[in-house]
Amino acid sequence: MATTALLIPCYNAERYLPNLKKQIEALNPKFDEVILVDDGSTDRTVERGRELGLTIEPLGVNRGPGAARNASVKRCRAEWIHFLDADDEIAPSYLKKVLPLTNAGVDVVLCACEDIDEQTRKKLMHWDYPDELWQKEPIRGAIQRGVVTYASFIRKAKFDEIGGFNEERRCWEDGDMHLRLALAGARFRAVPDVLCTSIRHARGTSGNRLYCHRCRLGFLQEYAKFSPPIDARDLIGEVMQTAAGLYQEGDFSAVDEALNLALRLGWKGPDSGHAGIKILNYLPFPWLKKMAFLKQRERRNRQ
């Protein structure tokens, strides 16, 4: 039987620790290792953990989620790892559902997940990862369906092979890690069950939409260097989605940066229904001239 580890980075998580302890105790079967690390909290996270009987190792200065998760991996010996944030929730049957797929030909097992509002418990997002897509086209899946951290059960050796999480950016580092797994040849499977839930509130980094859009653009600029094996059309679609988000947040210089990236990838201008059409009416005049030129050139090429 494969050995397993539940890895939990904590940052100002004092209020969530009682529920986290209940989540851990309810697991059946249980993980072989449960490792909690504190990423420079300014509240009583470490002390409250001790009061509850949870061992939380302080890491010192706050370095962000990617660095904290990488630190937790270095402290475990298990063959398979699952990341959970201190304010996340995990189904008691988690291991029962994912362990049957951990054979010699698999490196990552995904599960469906949900995001819910902390106050209302209303479902905000459903993350679904079709097994067939992830078996056949994991790179496309990772670009089009960014995988959240709590969705995956990962072979530690494969995680170590890619160098773990990016520690420079504090948003989209989870989607980036899973894409790099796919690019490294990791073999994926997925179960349809909702096994993990993320509690959403305004205090986390993901609540800063502008910062997250900028992180996504930074990652996409890096991925443009890997086309192929990443399909340029998939990248263009993600770039335009990001450009639309940046426009909504008012970062017009980043919008310009995103559109230039799309052009370098071969974008010919937005079609009806394309994400880019949402921002076309708001582009400055030089961009409108550029779009008109592209359309004219495309028509000439067809003649």
Each model region followed by its residue ranges:
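Short aromatic/hydrophobic "clamp" motif used to bind/position activated sugar donors
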Residues: I81
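Short, well-formed alpha-helical segments that are part of the catalytic scaffolds
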Residues: N12-A26
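Glycine-rich, basic loop-to-helix element that forms the pyrophosphate-binding segment
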Residues: L59-C76
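Catalytic core of nucleotide-sugar-dependent glycosyltransferases
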Residues: A186, V194-A202, S206-R233, S253-L265
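A conserved acidic beta->alpha catalytic loop
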Residues: D38-V46, V61, D85
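Acidic donor-binding loop at a coil-to-helix junction in glycosyltransferase catalytic cores
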Residues: R170-L179
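Short, flexible, basic/aromatic active-site loop/helix in glycosyltransferases
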Residues: A112, H126-R145, T149
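Conserved donor NDP-sugar-binding/catalytic core segment of glycosyltransferases
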Residues: S93-L124
